[in-house]
């Protein structure tokens, strides 16, 4: 087994262990037992449990980002792009695998409560916001708009909405209500969009300034 494959198998095993026993139960011994590997295999693949946790966060965020990007359709308006991306995240990341989302929330809480690894929570949300910023920039270019606020601020708002959407659904499993939230979020976020300046607009503005 290659090092890349070994790392992947360990991350998958860690996700299963955390979903079943929580982050505190995800010891290196428990993870390698779930993966069917030796303890030496873990230390061959990762230098520490902290490094493995970072890899786990990166894996889940990347999976969610791929799902959201795959929902973007060229030629659609920004509201449709927002709705489709949130729906893809909700259906493919939350509903299809709620255990992953529970793991991510628990990982953040565990990091915040554990001295020395608080940075993991910050890194987790840095990754979320960076991924969403990329989606927002792609969606804006596709729809011919620009954001009336800095894209980093819009990304922070989207992450806040998706957190509430996810936690609400994990608590009540009311999919219909979650879809209504997505529609409302698409309405609200699309109001932060404004037409992007065209080449003719730029030329006109330049002439006016020169006059």
Give, region by region, the residue ranges found by the protein language model.
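Hydrophobic/aromatic-rich alpha-helical bundle segments in the mid-to-C-terminal region
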Residues: 116-122, 140-204, 209-211
């Amino acid at each position: 087994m290659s090092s890349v494959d070994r790392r992947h198998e360990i991350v998958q095993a860690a996700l299963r262990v955390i979903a079943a026993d929580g982050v505190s139960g995800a010891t290196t011994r428990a993870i390698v037992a779930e993966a069917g590997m030796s303890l030496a295999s873990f230390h061959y693949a990762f230098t520490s449990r902290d490094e493995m946790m970072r890899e786990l966060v990166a894996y889940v965020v990347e999976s969610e980002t791929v799902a959201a990007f795959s929902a973007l359709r060229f030629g659609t308006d920004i509201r449709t792009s927002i709705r489709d991306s949130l729906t893809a995240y909700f259906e493919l990341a939350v509903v299809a695998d709620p255990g992953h989302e529970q793991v991510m929330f628990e990982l953040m809480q565990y990091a915040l409560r554990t001295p020395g690894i608080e940075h993991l929570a910050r890194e987790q949300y840095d990754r979320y916001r960076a991924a969403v910023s990329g989606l927002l920039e792609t969606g804006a270019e596709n729809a011919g708009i620009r954001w009336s606020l800095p894209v980093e601020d819009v990304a922070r708002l989207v992450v806040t909405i998706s957190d509430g959407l996810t936690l609400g659904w994990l608590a009540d499993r009311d999919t219909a209500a979650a879809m209504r939230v997505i529609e409302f979020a698409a309405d609200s976020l699309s109001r932060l969009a404004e037409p992007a300046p065209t080449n003719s607009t730029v030329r006109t503005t330049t002439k006016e300034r020169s006059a």
